Amino acid sequence: MQWAAGRRWAWITLFLTIVAVLIQAVWLWLGTQSFVFQREEIAQLARQYAGLDHELAFSRLIVELRRLHPGHVLPDEELQWVFVNAGGWMGAMCLLHASLSEYVLLFGTALGSHGHSGRYWAEISDTIISGTFHQWREGTTKSEVYYPGETVVHGPGEATAVEWGPNTWMVEYGRGVIPSTLAFALSDTIFSTQDFLTLFYTLRAYARGLRLELTTYLFGQDS
């Protein structure tokens, strides 16, 4: 019995060591990355259009992002609004840019929704265009509410309760280990709604973003 218990603890120690090394390797990798976008840049652009009709704001934002970052924003024919079910909430997103370490997307809900934010190996920031964003941070007993023009920052490893009012729309920027965020983003789609067409749309959008980044890297922004 003692031998079995010792072996079990050895495996646990080995597992925790591997996880610690992996986490350290990931953060070292992120430290070497050259990023296309900056959090404050996205927030500042979004604030310019806060309070406008969200469709008008989004169209102007896309034009400006393409001007500032040619070759890094998906073309109109590849932009698609896709449902997202995760953490008990439901919204919709339109992916503009995606790589292994960054993404930019439009997000929101026409009806309102609430649930768990998820924990990520990434920092995620949302700048509100319209509506309200309620956030209840872990370890606190009071929630905060954010309005158009304000930015909500969700740090790596953090978890919150989130609630969006009807017709809440925002611009979201994520930086970190982006593939790791897909596990949460797709969890309810796979295990609850079983909406596999939405699963396909989501993976296709991410694949398109990766393809665009690879093409721009290999052949330049005019390819």
From Swiss-Prot:
What family name appears in the similarity comment? Answer: Belongs to the ERG2 family.
What cystine linkages occur within this chain?
A: none
User: InterPro entries in the record, alphabetically?
Assistant: ERG2_sigma1_rcpt-like
Instruction: Kindly state a single biological-process term from the GO annotations of this entry.
Output: regulation of neuron apoptotic process
Ranges that cross the membrane: 10-30
Q: What is known of its domains?
A: The C-terminal helices form a flat, hydrophobic surface that is probably tightly associated with the cytosolic surface of the endoplasmic reticulum membrane.
Q: Where is this site: Important for ligand binding?
A: D126, E172
Source organism (scientific name): Trichosurus vulpecula
Q: Does the keyword Metal-binding apply?
A: no
Instruction: List the Cytoplasmic topological domains.
Output: 31-223
Name listed for the protein in its UniProt record: Sigma non-opioid intracellular receptor 1
Where does the UniProt annotation locate this protein? Nucleus inner membrane; Nucleus outer membrane; Nucleus envelope; Cytoplasmic vesicle
* Matching Pfam families: ERG2_Sigma1R
Transmembrane helix listed as a keyword = yes
Function, as annotated, reads: Functions in lipid transport from the endoplasmic reticulum and is involved in a wide array of cellular functions probably through regulation of the biogenesis of lipid microdomains at the plasma membrane. Involved in the regulation of different receptors it plays a role in BDNF signaling and EGF signaling. Also regulates ion channels like the potassium channel and could modulate neurotransmitter release. Plays a role in calcium signaling through modulation together with ANK2 of the ITP3R-dependent calcium efflux at the endoplasmic reticulum.
By which gene is this protein encoded?
A: SIGMAR1
